[in-house]
């Protein structure tokens, strides 16, 4: 288990080997029954992963909204995404006092689990604190859904992640609706298509709303606030 202890100037994730440093907290392996206050469990870090494809050609496509959510979180929380580890672009920071590790796997969507499994193991993040963020065709464009667990839902990225987490599904996930392909449009072509101006506006609003939901989850868990968030999202485009 990882646990952070407060220091005035720096914090860093420490597991099998040192990685790199940021400000405000020190995250280290915990011990039981010790007398040293530095090893007191205060906060459990979160691994927050956005799924997508690397490279400029995929930027702004429907399949990459998970990456875009990570970009919004990094901007809002002042996290620098400047390190490559476990085939992922990562950044370490905090939401208030809770340490977070943001990650964008660079393996391409269908192999995302290679990065997630490695990072979760290296930093010893418990399953309940691995938040997966990805696109969802079963939801209307711009509609969000935050759940404590679920299946793969025919999403190859989520399928890969579950495969590298020993088939376990009890990790939270934030789904970002992108709608369904119109008519007989090929699904792959739809996923790699950029949004229309109206759709893009809906996605940008969803990313802002989603970032606040992630903050609520990290600080308070799945409370009534998350339930209200899901209810509002479900009916956000319904006209009375």
UniProtKB/Swiss-Prot annotation:
GO molecular function: peptidyl-tRNA hydrolase activity
Main location (coarse class): plastid
GO cellular component: chloroplast stroma; ribonucleoprotein complex
Localization: Plastid, Chloroplast stroma
Keywords, ordered alphabetically: Chloroplast, mRNA processing, mRNA splicing, Plastid, Ribonucleoprotein, Transit peptide
GO annotation, biological process: mRNA processing; RNA splicing
InterPro entries: CRS2-like, Pept_tRNA_hydro, Pept_tRNA_hydro_CS, Pept_tRNA_hydro_sf
Self-association and partners: Part of large ribonucleo-protein complexes that include group IIB introns and either CAF1 or CAF2.
Function summary: Required for the splicing of group IIB introns in chloroplasts.
Homology family: Belongs to the PTH family. CRS2 subfamily.
UniProt-recorded name of the protein: Chloroplastic group IIB intron splicing facilitator CRS2-B, chloroplastic
Native species: Arabidopsis thaliana
Gene this chain is encoded by: CRS2B
């Amino acid at each position: 288990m990882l646990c952070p202890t407060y220091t005035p100037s720096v914090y860093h994730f420490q597991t099998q080997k040192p990685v790199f440093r940021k400000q405000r907290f020190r995250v280290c392996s915990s011990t039981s029954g010790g007398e040293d206050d530095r090893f007191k469990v205060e906060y459990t870090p979160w691994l927050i992963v956005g799924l997508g494809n690397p490279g400029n050609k995929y930027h702004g496509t429907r399949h990459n909204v998970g990456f875009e959510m990570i970009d919004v979180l990094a901007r809002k929380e002042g996290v620098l995404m400047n390190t490559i580890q476990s085939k992922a672009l990562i950044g370490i920071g905090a939401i208030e006092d809770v340490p977070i590790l943001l990650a964008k796997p660079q393996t391409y969507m269908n192999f995302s689990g290679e990065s997630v499994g490695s990072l979760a193991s290296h930093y010893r993040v418990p399953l309940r604190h691995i938040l997966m963020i990805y696109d969802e065709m079963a939801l209307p464009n711009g509609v969000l859904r935050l759940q404590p667990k679920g299946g793969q839902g025919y999403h190859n990225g989520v399928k890969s992640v579950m495969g590298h987490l020993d088939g376990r599904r009890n990790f939270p996930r934030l789904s970002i609706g992108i709608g369904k392909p119109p008519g007989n449009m090929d699904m792959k072509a739809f996923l790699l298509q950029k949004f229309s101006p109206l759709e893009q506006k809906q996605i940008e609003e969803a990313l802002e709303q989603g970032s606040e939901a992630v903050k609520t989850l990290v600080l308070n868990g799945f409370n009534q606030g998350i339930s209200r968030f899901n209810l509002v999202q479900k009916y956000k485009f319904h006209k009375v």
